[in-house]
């Protein structure tokens, strides 16, 4: 399944909505995704599963690229 991860680039700073980035990653569960990203030092705010019509909508974005770790 593909997940959309909302994160802050620096884990040691207070989260600010305007600085939130997102990425897409494939995993079997939210825990699996968080485990794959733990070495990136991101401040992960939210992990959202993406499927069905929502996935098709996200694929239309020019920024849609599934991160492979």
Curated annotation (Swiss-Prot):
Look up the EC number in the record and give it: 2.7.7.6
Its Gene Ontology biological processes?
Answer: DNA-templated transcription
InterPro entries per UniProt: RpoY (IPR009907)
Cross-referenced Pfam families: RpoY
Q: Does the keyword Transmembrane apply?
A: no
Q: Name one GO molecular function term.
A: DNA binding
**Main EC class of this protein?**
transferase
Per its UniProt entry, which superkingdom is the organism in?
Bacteria
Query: What keywords sit in the KW lines?
Result: DNA-directed RNA polymerase, Nucleotidyltransferase, Transcription, Transferase
Reactions the enzyme catalyzes? RNA(n) + a ribonucleoside 5'-triphosphate = RNA(n+1) + diphosphate
Tell whether Magnesium is among the UniProt keywords. Answer: no
**Biological role:** A non-essential component of RNA polymerase (RNAP).
Question: Whom does it interact with, and what assembly results?
Answer: RNAP is composed of a core of 2 alpha, a beta and a beta' subunit. The core is associated with a delta subunit, and at least one of epsilon or omega. When a sigma factor is associated with the core the holoenzyme is formed, which can initiate transcription.
Q: Which NCBIfam families match?
A: PRK13667.1
Q: What name does this protein carry?
A: DNA-directed RNA polymerase subunit epsilon
